[in-house]
Amino acid sequence: MVRLPARLTSKLAKARIAQIFNSAPPGPMLHCVDPAEVLHPGSAAPVSREKMHALLQNSAPVVWIGGSEPLLHSGIGHFVRAIAQSGHCVFLETDGVALRRRIHEFQPQPELVLAVRLDSLQSAESALATEGLRAARLSGFFTVIHSRVHEDLDPTQFTTVRPFITEKDVDGWLITAASSKEAVVRRAVEARRLIRSSFWRRFSKYVEEALLSQAPVREFRDAQAFTSEDVHEEAGEEGVRIA
């Protein structure tokens, strides 16, 4: 059964309601940050205090940590905890290769979700990513798989990921376009129909627009929850519980 992070659903709902009733100015729902922009181990200033302060004060309810592989940074555990303690929900995106080895540097928190990139179960890294997912689940973390749609997508590759998510008891599935090409974005829309949970389908669109943004600081500024894509929701949505 899929778990939905209660803190995440609550923060997104509050932000949407505030914007609908104009009690809060329009702003980003999701803010992306590359830890390489903030963490500089070995230098005279290992942490950019100015950028860290701006990040902690950011009004977006969700912070997506991605870009360069976060687990390559020695201070990533403290970095994640600082952001989560500031009141943000945090998604830490990783290829999962080093997740099992470094899982002890993190603490399960209601505000933290570990997002493991997994486009195919046949890739060379999939075995290590699977072990990382298992270690995270056994340690009590919220986990999601992030699958990216590329131009050369094999339409069958995601059909094997779907039963894998159920079998491994992963909490969610995000599917996003890897580029802004019209054909790729269209394929991502079609692929998202494989996601049983309507919440994760909608959140996939939040993440996709944020990651595809060309601005130096990538943000998703559209707080609208439903689009025409949601017309295709499946009638038999899987069991979901808030945790």
Place the predicted regions along the sequence by residue:
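N-terminal pre-core extensions flanking Radical SAM catalytic domains
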Residues: 1-45, 215, 220-223, 227, ...
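Hydrophobic, Leu/Ile/Phe/Ala-enriched alpha-helical segments that form helix-helix packing faces
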Residues: 21, 133-137, 165, 187-199
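Radical SAM/AdoMet-radical enzyme domain recognition
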Residues: 49-65, 73-177
